[in-house]
């Protein structure tokens, strides 16, 4: 039977509960246990698919097409286990399910209440499908005290009593701020956070204390005394120089040992952390450096590109180089020459996005990369802008544009109205809802033999990658574009939807309609990112 670890947060938001959960999952996995990680989000949205990147950050898409919290990206990258739509739930989804069942009459006329109906739905989600796992780690979004989170805290309180004794523990992530004028770490915010938890019936078993310095023995004793935890269960979560050092840092602090002790499990052997050690050696001792320009729309909110940042880091690990990122707001190119911003970089990446704002700047970035022979990687929207650039400046279609921006006489990019998922036809219309209506999740693509991209994928002729888009390049222009050197080297199996474009007479210029960053791992860098950084290394020797 699975054992459950509930991770909560206190004092302030953005402490890194997702990263802490992922690191703990990796440590347990390194000891030979089978783990599953799940995220419970208290907001009322059904999913983050229609939320602003500035508020929520990245939307992480799973193979089965779920739009989920970015923490699921951490879970996948640290454990290598693909997440599914069953690993993330929101208050909105729970309420939708309950109200649907109420309308059907499933509750037989009962008054629907937060307790027991909402809490029972949360518990059912947590317990579902865990039979073949040793540990299930459940992260509760937000911080203790948030009114939205109360049903979730109540549900996990009940679960500890529902499960057999010794099958559930609570890990509380908190902050120990250092006050320079006093010259000491302050424990009072943590004490109040734990007091809030205890007031709703939850006694933490382990305190995971974020800090930038060592916790003095006296402060550790004070936390143990006033928070009612063992002194050994006050874990020092020191800041790390990079996120892939966190598993080693937490192991050195004793987190995994304390978790096993809380369950009454005697550790058989220390965790196998050599792989993590090797990765950190590569990160800390690079053999060179490259600079990649990210020409985007949401550059003020780096979390909007979380998986992208990590995938570029993985490309650096694969090539033993440090990857420096130069964030450039694409709007600056609309009235400025791109050259002064891009002449110093070793590669240009234009990521996914939506809407017209900044689109012309991305088109200029693609043109600069094509004409100056700088490695270019266009992802989703970045591929579409590269195709429009080619149509305008190579083929001579001056009005080439996307219907996403409004009516156009030359729709190089248009709204998808139907596509195949397996053997089933999916249809969409412009008048439909925004949420959950894109082409989402894993789809196959067929690669042309002899193409650059096929070589990057090890000679593969069929791949599967994750998608998140509702617009697609118009194949009616395919022949004219190919006559001018832009090769369509990847298509959907039915040949209808372009998936990959490339210039073969360019050092490295590839656009993909999918999101390869979602499948990159530190131990298995995505081949496109490894190849892109390799091309940037070559470029760095030419600049």
UniProtKB/Swiss-Prot annotation:
Allosterically activated by GTP, when glutamine is the substrate; GTP has no effect on the reaction when ammonia is the substrate. The allosteric effector GTP functions by stabilizing the protein conformation that binds the tetrahedral intermediate(s) formed during glutamine hydrolysis. Inhibited by the product CTP, via allosteric rather than competitive inhibition. The active site is at residues 380, 515, 517. Its EC number is 6.3.4.2. InterPro entries: Class_I_gatase-like, CTP_synthase, CTP_synthase_N, GATASE, GATase1_CTP_Synthase, P-loop_NTPase. The keyword Cell inner membrane does not apply. It is an enzyme of class 6 (ligase). L-glutamine binds at residues 54, 353, 381-384, 404, 470. PROSITE patterns: GATASE_TYPE_1. One of its GO terms (molecular function) is identical protein binding. It catalyses: UTP + L-glutamine + ATP + H2O = CTP + L-glutamate + ADP + phosphate + 2 H(+); L-glutamine + H2O = L-glutamate + NH4(+); UTP + NH4(+) + ATP = CTP + ADP + phosphate + 2 H(+). Keywords: ATP-binding, Glutamine amidotransferase, Ligase, Magnesium, Metal-binding, Nucleotide-binding, Pyrimidine biosynthesis. Catalyzes the ATP-dependent amination of UTP to CTP with either L-glutamine or ammonia as the source of nitrogen. Regulates intracellular CTP levels through interactions with the four ribonucleotide triphosphates. CTPSs have evolved a hybrid strategy for distinguishing between UTP and CTP. The overlapping regions of the product feedback inhibitory and substrate sites recognize a common feature in both compounds, the triphosphate moiety. To differentiate isosteric substrate and product pyrimidine rings, an additional pocket far from the expected kinase/ligase catalytic site, specifically recognizes the cytosine and ribose portions of the product inhibitor. Homotetramer. This is CTP synthase. It comes from Nitrobacter winogradskyi (strain ATCC 25391 / DSM 10237 / CIP 104748 / NCIMB 11846 / Nb-255). The gene is pyrG.
């Amino acid at each position: 039977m699975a054992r459950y670890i509930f991770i909560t947060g206190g004092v302030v938001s953005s402490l890194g509960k997702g990263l802490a959960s992922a690191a703990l999952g990796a440590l347990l996995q390194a000891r030979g246990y089978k783990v599953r990680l799940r995220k419970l989000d208290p907001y009322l949205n059904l999913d983050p698919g229609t939320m602003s990147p500035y508020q929520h950050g990245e939307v992480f898409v799973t193979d089965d097409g779920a739009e989920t919290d970015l923490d699921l990206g951490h879970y996948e990258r640290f454990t290598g286990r693909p997440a599914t739509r069953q690993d993330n739930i929101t208050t909105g989804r729970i309420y939708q399910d309950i109200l649907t069942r109420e309308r059907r009459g499933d509750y037989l006329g009962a008054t629907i209440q937060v307790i027991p109906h909402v809490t029972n739905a949360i518990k059912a989600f947590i317990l579902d499908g865990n039979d073949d796992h040793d540990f299930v780690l459940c992260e509760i979004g937000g911080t203790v005290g948030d009114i939205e989170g109360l049903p979730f805290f109540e549900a996990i309180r009940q679960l500890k009593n529902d499960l057999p004794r010794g099958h559930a523990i609570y890990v509380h992530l908190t902050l120990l701020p250092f006050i320079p004028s006093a010259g000491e770490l302050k424990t009072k915010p943590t004490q109040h956070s734990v007091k809030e938890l205890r007031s709703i019936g939850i006694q933490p078993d382990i305190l995971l204390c974020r800090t930038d310095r060592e916790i003095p023995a006296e402060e550790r004793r004070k936390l143990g005394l006033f928070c009612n935890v063992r002194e050994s269960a006050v874990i020092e979560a020191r800041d790390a120089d990079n996120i892939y050092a966190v598993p080693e840092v937490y192991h050195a602090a004793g987190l995994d040992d304390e978790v096993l002790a809380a369950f009454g499990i005697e550790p058989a052997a220390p965790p196998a952390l050599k792989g993590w050690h090797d990765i950190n050696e590569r990160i800390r001792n690079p053999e060179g450096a490259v600079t990649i320009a990210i020409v985007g729309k949401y550059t003020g909110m780096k979390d909007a590109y979380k998986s992208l940042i990590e995938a570029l880091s993985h490309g650096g690990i694969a090539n033993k180089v440090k990857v420096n990122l130069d964030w450039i707001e694409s709007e600056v190119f609309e009235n400025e020459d791109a050259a002064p911003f891009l002449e110093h970089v070793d590669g240009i990446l234009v990521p996914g996005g939506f809407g017209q704002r900044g689109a012309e700047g991305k088109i200029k970035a693609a043109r600069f990369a094509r004409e100056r022979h700088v490695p270019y990687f266009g992802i989703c929207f970045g591929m579409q802008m590269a195709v429009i650039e080619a149509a305008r400046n190579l083929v001579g279609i001056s009005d080439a544009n996307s219907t996403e921006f409004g009516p156009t006489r030359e729709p190089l990019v248009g709204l998808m109205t139907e596509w195949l998922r397996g053997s089933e036809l999916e249809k969409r219309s412009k008048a439909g809802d925004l949420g959950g209506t894109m082409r989402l999740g894993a789809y196959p693509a067929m690669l042309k033999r002899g193409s650059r991209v096929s070589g990057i994928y090890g000679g593969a002729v069929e791949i599967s990658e994750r998608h998140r888009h509702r617009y697609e390049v118009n194949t009616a222009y395919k022949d004219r574009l190919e006559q001018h050197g832009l090769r369509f080297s990847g298509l959907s199996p039915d040949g209808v939807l372009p998936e990959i474009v490339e210039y073969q007479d360019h050092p490295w210029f590839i656009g993909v309609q999918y999101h390869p960053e979602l499948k990159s791992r530190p131990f298995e860098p995505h081949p496109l990112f490894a190849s892109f950084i390799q091309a940037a290394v070559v470029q760095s020797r030419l600049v």
